[in-house]
Amino acid sequence: MGTRFLLALCLVLLVLGFEVQGTQLPKQDEPPSPALLSQVQESLSSYWESAKAAAQKLYEKTYLPAVDEKLRDLYSKSTAAMSTYTGIFTDQVLSVLKGEE
């Protein structure tokens, strides 16, 4: 497996993990509408809910505090690095746009 695949997999699992741990808000009943857009939205919502439920079961089954801590540490380090590199990139773009004076 490539590094990109593992990174993408970790990010997807991290997002699903945060979604699973998030607060559960009560759903409000909406009147049914025959519009195609609402049907697609309901279908996608049901797929997301089933994926979230599967992730919740997997999370509860395989929860390891050490791995969770490592993932959180990895996330914080990677976001810190990205903000640093974004700042460097922004400075470079601004210096190119500004030009030599």
UniProtKB/Swiss-Prot annotation:
The keyword Secreted applies. Proapolipoprotein C-II is synthesized as a sialic acid containing glycoprotein which is subsequently desialylated prior to its proteolytic processing. Proapolipoprotein C-II, the major form found in plasma undergoes proteolytic cleavage of its N-terminal hexapeptide to generate apolipoprotein C-II, which occurs as the minor form in plasma. Keywords: Chylomicron, Glycoprotein, HDL, LDL, Lipid degradation, Lipid metabolism, Lipid transport, Secreted, Sialic acid, Signal, Transport, VLDL. One of its GO terms (molecular function) is lipid binding. Residues 1-17 form the signal peptide. Residues 78-101 are annotated as: Lipoprotein lipase cofactor. Coiled coil: none annotated. Belongs to the apolipoprotein C2 family. This is Apolipoprotein C-II. It comes from Chlorocebus sabaeus (Green monkey). The gene is APOC2.
